[in-house]
Amino acid sequence: MSFDSIPILDLSLARNEETKPAFLRDLRHTLLEVGFLYIKNTGIPETLISDVIAQGKAFFDLPDEEKLAIEMKNKPSFLGYSRLGMEVTRFKVDWREQLDLSTPHPMPGPDDPLYYNLLAPNQWPSTPGFREVYEDYMTRMGKMSIEFTSLIAEAIGLPADAFDRFFDASQQHKLKIVKYPDLAELGVEGEAQGVGPHKDSMLTSYLLQASHHRGLQVQNHEGEWIDCPPIDGTLVVAVGQGMQALTRGVCLSTTHRVLSPARGAGARYSIPFFQGVSYDATFESMDVPESVTALRDEVQARRGAKQDDVEFTFRPGQWDHLGSATLYNRIKSHPDVGEKWDQYPEILAGIRKQHAQQGHVSEALPSG
């Protein structure tokens, strides 16, 4: 039997010693069976959430010249504005417009590893109040995400600080502000890919659904797509491939996608926050208690072979450092940035060679 809805967990229960054990049991069940959940009562002020949404939507109303002044390909950091259709997932164009931000870092030095290019200052729009709102939100979300990963650790029988070694000065939380135009604006009949089927990369990510539109879908174990509609007062949490690898498959990373809004529905907005880890770290599986791995084996045996549109690709030991893996994935998703900066052509050529050997051809990005 596979899941047919996404569970909702109340984070305030984890902050009360009397209700915390029940919360951890529910969290463990969700990690093993679903890998996707809503959380409510996060502690992020509602006034800040409202400001984040308002400022995010207003950004896309800026004149094109103001947005292009902070275009992603202006810098080798993969931070900044991406025009409609400039990102690729599973060799197809994602029909979305977005701004990528991160927690603050100074410019990398000349002797730093290449992946330190990712650790750089943001390109900020000039909108009054925008930077202050988003810096506040990212700071609060960073703290909350570390709290949540400590709860994941406890839920699967590890010490609360089991993941702390992945958080240091080269840790970079990331955030996207995303606009998905509807099919009428795109001039498309039927369906369009807002973002293609994928699994998130690292530990956990937290999505603020910033408009009333449906579109986010999660793939269950039978291959069916389950709606994950907006629910007021919640964030959607996705378990990343890194978390699945670290926990020996106990925490499930689940495939998800976004469909473009229907004709006449207007644009959908979302603001995902991606918990970062140290780019200098390597991933090695943790010693998860046998009682929990036995539960994992029981769940896997019960549900049988998993039908999944996206293969699990995160392999411990595949990369010298997590930063190298992250840089590779950024170049893969944003080939226009990879083409522009002379540090990246060898990596981009390797990606394209691998795709050609596998018989894949990526859709062409829009010109301009």
UniProtKB/Swiss-Prot annotation:
Summary of the protein's practical applications: FR901469 inhibits the activity of 1,3-beta-glucan synthase from Candida albicans and Aspergillus fumigatus. With minimal inhibitory concentrations (MICs) against Candida albicans and Aspergillus fumigatus of 0.63 ug/ml and 0.16 ug/ml, repectively, FR901469 displays greater inhibitory activity than other 1,3-beta-glucan synthase inhibitors such as, WF11899A, echinocandin B, aculeacin A, and papulacandin B.
Name of the protein described by the UniProt record: 2-oxoglutarate-dependent dioxygenase frbJ
The Fe2OG dioxygenase domain, residue ranges: 171-277
Claim: Signal is one of the keywords in the record: no
Protein family per UniProt: Belongs to the iron/ascorbate-dependent oxidoreductase family.
Enzyme Commission number, as recorded: 1.14.-.-
Organism: Dothideomycetidae sp. (strain 11243)
Record function comment: 2-oxoglutarate-dependent dioxygenase; part of the gene cluster that mediates the biosynthesis of the antifungal antibiotic FR901469, an inhibitor of beta-1,3-glucansynthase, exerting antifungal activity against the pathogenes Candida albicans and Aspergillus fumigatus. FR901469 is a cyclic depsipeptide containing 12 amino acid residues and a fatty acid chain. The NRPS frbI contains 12 modules responsible for the formation of the depsipeptide backbone which is denoted as Acyl-Thr-Ala-Tyr-Val-4OHPro-Thr-Thr-3OHPro-threo3OHGln-Gly-Thr-Orn-OH (C71H116N14O23).
SUPFAM superfamilies the UniProt entry points to: Clavaminate synthase-like (SSF51197)
Keyword Oxidoreductase included in the entry's annotation: yes
Binding, Fe cation: 198, 200, 256
Binding site for 2-oxoglutarate: 268
Pfam families linked to this entry: 2OG-FeII_Oxy, DIOX_N
A GO term, aspect molecular function: metal ion binding
Pathway participation: Antifungal biosynthesis
GO biological processes: small molecule biosynthetic process
Keywords per UniProt: Dioxygenase, Iron, Metal-binding, Oxidoreductase
